[in-house]
Amino acid sequence: MPAFFVAGEAAAVDCRAYPTPGVDWSNCKKRLLMLDNSNFEGANLSGVDFSMTDLSRTNLKKSNFSKAMLVRASLAGSDATSASFERAEGYRSNLSGISASGASFVSAEMQRSNFSDADLTNVDFTKAELGRAIFYKAKLANTRFALVNLSRATFHNVDMNGPVDFTNAFLFLTRIEGVDLSKATGLEQDQIALACGDDRTQLPEGLKTPPSWPCEDE
């Protein structure tokens, strides 16, 4: 018998339930499914295995993806406003065009994920693994990358229209060519020395352009 979500009542875990607002699929296996254009607003999706599942153009507002498996999943074009992805595993996931304002990716493992054209304002990535992630044309403001591994990540053409915290972030060969970092906070000179910028890269006050950049010969 299908389970229905009733406002004000706690939904019981039901792995056979249809995608509905507030559904509880915690720790269910939902691999290789086509769930695009669904409505999971407020759903409990913690620990769910969504590997290679299509969640594109889906309402994920205020949903809980903590410790979920999102390997090679697609959330492209979805609305994940105020959602939690804490400790999620999303290697090579597609989050291009996602609206994730106010979301939390604290301690998430999102290596090689695609955040192109994403709205990442007020997003907390503290202690996340984002090596080789792509942030092409992403919108960043009040975004936190503190203690994040951003090695070889790409920030080309980002819209950084507010402060972005890079405190103790690892920026080994991070691509910041042409990026305006003048509003960034927490950056130190030794972090900049590891990154790949160019003569168009704008640094915060007090930091100097290195004599050379590691990726100049590429």
Report each predicted region and the residues it spans.
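Bacterial N-terminal signal peptides
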Residues: M1-F4
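Tandem repeat scaffolds
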Residues: A11-E218
